[in-house]
């Protein structure tokens, strides 16, 4: 008859070893969970107009913060927006130093309140941005029609350049200053009474176009860099019309006329009042100086 097998009682040294092993496992799990709670940034996107440049990313932080670094291909990394809870970082001051360079940025993720913590590879989680060349990729800002003047059957239209955040000798440069002849303007113009548009192009800031005498025209302009493959065109400028300008002068004329009319009325009223006062004063004086009748 076989003796029943009883559960084995562990020896003291075996129990200690198992306890130590279990503690080590818990420590690893806790460390791993701390790392897992820090999420790497994603969807890094450059947003740039007239060289005002902001890097955006996701996700909104939960118990974590971000730091951004930027570099040229041959340069050193520079840290910006330290330990921020924002999901964007303004990098304009770096990229305007040389807008023809190609830049790369990266976003580091840190646990909130423990920025010294690193990932499993011995460094914080991070994600790289796409490469960005401002001269080739920044969006062109909306231009403005500065003025237009008609002489006979010719109209001279002048475009006002947008200012950029690129500086030279402590002066902000215009789009024309930065892009030179790479920048052209396209003018769209049409009769106020018609929807048919005509176009004209120039690599300066002025247009001289032929128009029909006696007709009012409307204008809109667009900035274009033909050599680009992306972001070639700006949005159209606000529409300006010749009739609107005449209407403004007419409105000013009416206002001035109304003011003059009111002033004339006030002068007349004042003159009548003064005349009545003088007449009343003369009558009173005559009565006072008249001799009394003695009966």
Swiss-Prot record:
GO cellular component term of the entry, any: collagen-containing extracellular matrix
Self-association and partners: Interacts with HSPE; the interaction, inhibited by heparin, promotes the generation of activated factor X and activates coagulation in the presence of activated factor VII.
Classification via Gene3D superfamilies: Immunoglobulins
Keywords annotated in UniProt: Blood coagulation, Disulfide bond, Glycoprotein, Hemostasis, Lipoprotein, Membrane, Palmitate, Secreted, Signal, Transmembrane, Transmembrane helix
Keyword DNA-binding: no
Side of membrane Cytoplasmic, spans: 275-295
Name the record gives this protein: Tissue factor
Family under the similarity heading: Belongs to the tissue factor family.
Signal peptide: 1-32
Pfam families found in the cross-reference section: Interfer-bind, Tissue_fac
Residue stretches spanning the membrane: 252-274
Positions in the Extracellular compartment: 33-251
Motif interval(s): WKS motif: 46-48, 77-79, 190-192
């Amino acid at each position: 008859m076989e003796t029943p097998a009883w559960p084995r009682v562990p020896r003291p040294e075996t129990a200690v070893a198992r306890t130590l092993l279990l503690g080590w496992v818990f420590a690893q799990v806790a460390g791993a969970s701390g790392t897992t709670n820090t999420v790497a940034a994603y969807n890094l996107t450059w947003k740039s107009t007239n060289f005002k440049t902001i890097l955006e990313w996701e996700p909104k932080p939960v118990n974590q913060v971000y730091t951004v670094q930027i570099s040229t291909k041959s340069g050193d990394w520079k840290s910006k927006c330290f330990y921020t809870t924002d999901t964007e970082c303004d990098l304009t001051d770096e990229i305007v130093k040389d807008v023809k360079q190609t830049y790369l940025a990266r976003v580091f993720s840190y646990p909130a309140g423990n920025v010294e913590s690193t990932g499993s590879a011995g460094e914080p989680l991070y994600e790289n941005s796409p490469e960005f060349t401002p001269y080739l990729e920044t969006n062109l800002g909306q231009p403005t029609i500065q003025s237009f003047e008609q002489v006979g059957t010719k109209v001279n239209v002048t475009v006002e350049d947008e200012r950029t955040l690129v500086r030279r000798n402590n002066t902000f440069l215009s789009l024309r200053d930065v892009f030179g002849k790479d920048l052209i303007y396209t003018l769209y113009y049409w009769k106020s009474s018609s929807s048919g548009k005509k176009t004209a192009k120039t690599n300066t800031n002025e247009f001289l176009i032929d128009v029909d005498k006696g007709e009012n025209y409307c204008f809109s302009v667009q900035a274009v860099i033909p050599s680009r493959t992306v972001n070639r065109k700006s949005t159209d400028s606000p529409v300006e019309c010749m009739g609107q300008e005449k209407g403004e002068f007419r409105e000013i004329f009416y206002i001035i006329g109304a003011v003059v009319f009111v002033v004339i009325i006030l002068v007349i009223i004042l003159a009548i009042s003064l005349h009545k006062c003088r007449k009343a004063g003369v009558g009173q004086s005559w009565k006072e100086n008249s001799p009394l009748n003695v009966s």
